Each structure stands twice: as structure tokens, then as C-alpha cells.
Amino acid sequence: MQQPQPQGQQQPGPGQQLGVQGAAPGAGGGPGGGPGPGPCLRRELKLLESIFHRGHERFRIASACLDELSCEFLLAGAGGAGAGAAPGPHLPSRGSVPGDPVRIHCNITESYPAVPPIWSVESDDPNLAAVLERLVDIKKGNTLLLQHLKRIISDLCKLYNLPQHPDVEMLDQPLPAEQCTQEEVSSEDEDEEMPEDTEDLDHYEMKEEEPAEGKKSEDDGIGKENLAILEKIKKNQRQDYLNGAVSGSVQATDRLMKELRDIYRSQSFKGGNYAVELVNDSLYDWNVKLLKVDQDSALHNDLQILKEKEGADFILLNFSFKDNFPFDPPFVRVVSPVLSGGYVLGGGAICMELLTKQGWSSAYSIESVIMQISATLVKGKARVQFGANKSQYSLTRAQQSYKSLVQIHEKNGWYTPPKEDG
């Protein structure tokens, strides 16, 4: 099953995607809420590249930028496996040969370090899965990237019966104090408190009419059409209350109203990256159209062909929310078109840990989840299946296939199913 951050064939194809639980993941620098990565991250990356350069004998930083990191763990001398030896339990088992490096990828959200880095590995080896899953224990600090990599390298050395490399200890050296400001430290606490505070404000707003000045501030940046939608939702809620037909919960309704307002203000939304429609005016049932994907991807080309054939050049997702949102994730599935790859399961469910109870955080924003799914489809090499039977995508089948995958994960750890399984 896929972790929050996707990687493509050059990253995992049929291989494993295993990540660390974090908040609001915005792949490729997508919106994640909160301040963007600051000077600390730049200093961390610079330190990493200076220690684990491309000529390092054990661990190498292949590429690094503010939102993504690729690195390699070299297996020379691992487990005594000689050339041509059959892969053992501690050697890459899929898509590689003994001695190939372990390729590891990291995505960094805009909210780092309040949001931990999210890791993935190009392998379906459960031993590597365990290495990444243990990173969930490291959640706090301004140098999470360094802390995570120290744990990864140390655990990989143990896994492959290699001596601990002395350069790993260099990751403990402090960064210059002037680069990591108190503002960055305090922003982490502010981010963690934000959902509760904003929910309280939203709850008040639903009960009482805001003063004109306060309402103007709340509506700032939202277009007239979308303001009309918000007003209609409030009107329907009041009417349902009067009729004794209230659905959902105050907690979920308040948070979903906040999420919708934030989306309407978002530059990604206004820029046409995606669109949101409420199904039957229900705040708990969203249709999301992914209107733009990476133009260099095969998926983008497929969508252009789809437009010529069927007049639709978008991917339609459905988000279904329960009464206990935001403490449980939405159920997300692909409605159309039928896709292969991209970690899309039978029925259209999406195989990502962040969409499970274990990987979900109430601090996630819905926009960042949308952007993350878009990135996952592209990096997972999703392709449109032209001529496929559209009836194979349904809510019931998606729920069944996803439930089955979650049960397997709980017993055996995270893994990516074979391509033929979606």
C-alpha cells in the first residue's frame, strides 16, 4: 500500500512506497498550509550534500532541493553476497540485482519542520518497510531531516550487516543558531494549535451572524460565486436545524466549512489546477476534478487524447467525509477515467497511507491532500485505460478493495500491490 508520498518508475514502479506519517503533504511544493521551509532546511541540505557527496562510499545525496531529496545507500560488501549471488532476505528483491544501491526518496512539505519529511523507497522488501516505518518515532525538532537520515543510515547498516559509518555522527552537529530563528520554532506550535482554534471560530460563526467588519475579513479573497455557495450551505444548515433533520456533526461541519473557504481562497484553486463541486449540495460529499497534471507526464498526454475522444480532460475524484472528520480521513476514490498504475486499486480506491487512520492527521488540509494525490498519480506512472469498462469503478468495490488492502497492511506491513492489481 502506498505511503503519503509517491514516486514514479524512476522512483518506485511496482516497488514499494513507504513513508513517514506527517501533516498536510504537498508534493512538489504543493500547498500544505503554514510557512514554507525556512533557512534551517537550506542549511540541512547543504550539510547533507557536504557529508554525503556523490563520491561517498556508503551513502550519497543524488539530488536535493527544498521540496524533494533523492539518495542512495550503497551495498558494497553487504551480507557477504558476491557477484551473481541470489538475493537474500536483506537484498533488494524486486526490480534490482544484488549489489544495486537502495534508492530512497523524500518529499518535504511547505510546513516543514512542523510537518515531518515523508519517505519512500524503491523496493517491496518488508525489511525496508520496517526501516521507514520506525521514523514515526521522530516527530519533533528543527532538524528532522538530519535526524531521519541518521536513523535510516544506521538501520540500513544493521539490516545489511555493515559497520556503522563514522560520517553518520556528523549529522548531530548543530546548525548555526542565526539560521534557525525562534520564529520557525514557534511556528510549529502555532501550526499544531491552528486547527482547534480555527474550528472554534468557525463554530461561533455558524451560530451567530458576524459583524460586518469581521465578515469582510473572513470573505476576503473568495469570489462571488463561491461566496454564494457558502451562503447556500449555511442556509441549508439552518433550515435542516429548524426541521430537525441535522446531518453530520458540528465538529465535522465546522471544519469542512473552513476547508472549503480555504480552498476558495487558494491560488491553486483560482489558477485552475483543480475544481471542487459539492454533490447534491452536501458538505460531506465532494467531487474534485484534477484539471492540471505535470505537462511532461504520460498522464497529461493521455488526458489530451481523452479530451479529443470524450470531451473531458480531467480526473474526477470523490471525497466522502464522515461525522468524525477531521479525526478520521476522507474516503477518496477515482471516479473516472479508468486508470492503471498510479497506485489506484480496484474500484478506484487510492493506495496511500495518508488516507488511512494510521497515516492520517487532523492537521492535514484537504487542498494539500488533493495536490498530493495529483502528484502520486503522476509519479506512480498512472495511465488512462482507453476503452476500459467504466462500470469497474464504483463506491462499493472501491471500499471493498481498500478495506482488504488495509487489513493486509495491518498484518504484514506496507507494500505496493502488483501492477495487475492496480
Curated annotation (Swiss-Prot):
Pfam families: UQ_con (PF00179). Coiled coil: none annotated. It comes from the Eukaryota. GO terms for molecular function: ATP binding; ubiquitin conjugating enzyme activity. Disulfide bonds: none annotated. It catalyses: S-ubiquitinyl-[E1 ubiquitin-activating enzyme]-L-cysteine + [E2 ubiquitin-conjugating enzyme]-L-cysteine = [E1 ubiquitin-activating enzyme]-L-cysteine + S-ubiquitinyl-[E2 ubiquitin-conjugating enzyme]-L-cysteine. Pathway: Protein modification; protein ubiquitination. It is found in: Nucleus; Cell projection, Filopodium; Cytoplasm, Cytosol. Disruption phenotype: No reproductive defects in males but females have reduced litter size due to embryo implantation failure, normal ovulation but a longer estrus cycle, reduced levels of serum prolactin at the beginning of lactation, abnormal sexual behavior and show reduced offspring care. Autoubiquitinated in vitro in the presence of NEDD4L. Keywords: Acetylation, ATP-binding, Cell projection, Cytoplasm, Nucleotide-binding, Nucleus, Transferase, Ubl conjugation, Ubl conjugation pathway. Residues 25-35 have a biased composition (Gly residues). Its EC number is 2.3.2.23. The active site is at C351 (glycyl thioester intermediate). Expressed in liver, brain, heart, spleen, lung, kidney, muscle, ovary, epididymis, testis and placenta. Also expressed in thymus and ES cells. Only expressed in the uterus during pregnancy. Expressed in oocytes and during subsequent embryonic development stages (4-cell stage, blastocyst, 8.5 dpc, 13.5 dpc, 16.5 dpc and 18.5 dpc). Residues 1-24 have a biased composition (Low complexity). GO terms for cellular component: cytosol; filopodium; nucleus. Residues 185-200 have a biased composition (Acidic residues). Residues 251-415 form the UBC core domain. Catalyzes the covalent attachment of ubiquitin to other proteins. Involved in female fertility and embryo implantation. May be involved in hormonal homeostasis in females. Involved in regulation of B4GALT1 cell surface expression, B4GALT1-mediated cell adhesion to laminin and embryoid body formation. Belongs to the ubiquitin-conjugating enzyme family. Monomer and homodimer. Only the homodimer is linked to ubiquitin through thiolester activation. Interacts (via N-terminus) with B4GALT1 (via N-terminal cytoplasmic domain); the interaction is direct. This is Ubiquitin-conjugating enzyme E2 Q1.
